[in-house]
Amino acid sequence: MSFCLGSQRIMGLIGKNGAGKSTTLKSILNMVSPESGSVKIFQKDFSQYEKECKQRIGVVFGGIDFYPLKKLSVITAVTQKFYTDWDQEQYQKYIKRFALDESKKFKELSNGMKVKYLLALALSHHAELLILDEPTSGLDPVSREELLHIFRQIVKNENCSILFSTHITSDLDKCADDITYIQNGCVLKSAGKDTFLHSFEHLKMPEDTGLLTLEEIMLRTERSEWDDDAAV
């Protein structure tokens, strides 16, 4: 499996459930051990410079409920001790921007506010790479649209790149610069979004006008695999 994310870009990871999106992200972070290969982040071998690299990475996994009974202020006090480049002024800026109440317990936040809080933590140590696993899962359309807008602003204003896995392909239609399609644990295609969309024109039907959406590409690609399996 091989793909590359450039500076100040958003890459979307797509693939059906079980394809390997979350495992890929966990492998990058050394949360699971890959059987072979290597991960380079900031042009350094992650296995050799993990501690240094993690100072420059922010992670947001959807559905995380760590310290659910603790107030945000307490979680922040613990978190900031792990980062040498923690910026309290930056943290307060994002707490205010995201309208977060530090006196609230983590479990009292909505799913959207939980993601915003995790983003605030990540951006407060000036992360240059955000790794997001299904961050918009379970959110209503308005909250999802707001987060996508935030992602675009982060990349533009914070000298940051985003690696973003999701099964909601319409989110990536709106915000991704690059797309990586994972199928059965392998990269089927990884390219800039326009190049990616054009590379699947062979899946178009006579009645189709314009390029296929990411959802249509996934459905037709996976359907083709089902047909191949049925024919065996």
Residue ranges, per PLM feature:
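Conserved ABC transporter NBD signature motif
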Residues: 5, 37-48, 52-53
